[in-house]
Amino acid sequence: PPIKPLVDIPRMAEISRDMVRGSLGALVKRDVEAASRIWQRDDEVDELHQHVYRELLTIMTEDPARIERATYLIWASHNLERIADRATNIAERVVFVCTGHVPTRDEWLDKQLANSG
């Protein structure tokens, strides 16, 4: 039987895939705005990974017979989170290539707040 319903891991895969496509598209088009949007998606994947990690640790604690399967899912989640991080790295370099500056996360968030208000 499945260790848990796989909802978050497929969602992480979808977002990570979209991030890679988005960062590569931003690179090809030299699109700073598209590259900047990648950061927001990275936070979403990070949160999903933390949720999956905590949930699977609980499962392993409650049922040691599931440790091996849960460990494989934790690694899958971790690797998807790293893919999202790599897409973010590409996006940061796109911003640098186009502007000569990579804003800090705080600068980027301030800009997003200013644009939404």
Regions found by a protein language model. Name each.
Residues 1-117:
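Cytosolic, long alpha-helical scaffolding segments
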